[in-house]
Design a protein with these regions (language model features):
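OB-fold ssDNA-binding interfaces and closely related basic DNA-contact patches used
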Residues: 1-145
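Short acidic, glycine/tyrosine-flanked loop/strand segments centered on an H-E-D-like triad
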Residues: 134-171
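A recognition module on extended beta-rich or small alphabeta surfaces enriched in W/G with H and D/E
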Residues: 174-176
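Conserved small/polar residues in nucleotide/adenosyl-binding loops
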Residues: 179
Length: 180
């Protein structure tokens, strides 16, 4: 089989692994809340029902999809080969991603990064929607959940940004040396 060379190859997204949820704040606007266990969401009810049997929790509808707040903070997963990890500073608005940078270069405008260079100042402005947030994405396979596809874990946290990339590199290196 010969792939089309100018199209990115990928597995279908089966669902999302979430570490937070939104709760109503004092002003009526939604406020993010960190969870102690994982929350899984998918467009396919059967995947969420299977996950609930494995990891506990009750299946419910959520924004046109299905979700389960699991009862576990550990989920067995596999990292498929290829580009399954990405990190950017990103700023989103109602119209989509407005900035995507690496801390120096902003790729959507092909210009310099517009955010402050100092992390604490950037974090403060990001909390107000005025600067980019670190955005770390990792695609994994949940081998015990039926179906083919990846589950995307996305984090905007500092520790995910500084630790996950090193963990993925370590796992890939160990795999190349047949340690895993």
């Amino acid at each position: 089989m010969t792939p089309i060379l100018d199209l990115q190859q990928r597995l279908v997204e089966a669902g999302r692994i979430r570490t937070g949820a939104s709760t109503p704040g004092q002003s009526g606007r939604k406020v993010p809340k960190k969870l102690e266990t994982f929350r899984l969401t998918s467009r396919e009810r059967g995947r969420i029902e299977a996950a609930a049997k494995l990891f506990g929790g009750t299946v419910q509808q959520w924004e046109g999809q299905w979700e389960v707040y699991t009862e576990t903070n550990e989920i067995p997963c596999l990292i498929p080969p290829g580009a399954q990890f990405s990190q950017w500073y990103e700023l989103w608005s109602g119209g989509g991603c407005t900035r995507r940078c690496d801390g120096h270069h902003e790729y959507l405008s092909d210009g310099p990064c517009l955010c402050p260079g100092e992390y604490d100042e950037k974090r403060e402005l990001a909390s107000k929607g005025k600067a980019c947030k670190p955005t770390t994405r990792l695609n994994v396979i949940l081998p015990d959940v039926p179906g083919i596809g990846v589950w995307r874990l996305e984090s905007h946290g500092y520790y995910a940004a500084v630790e996950l990339s090193t963990m993925v590199k370590l796992i890939e290196q160990a795999d190349r040396k047949s340690v895993v």
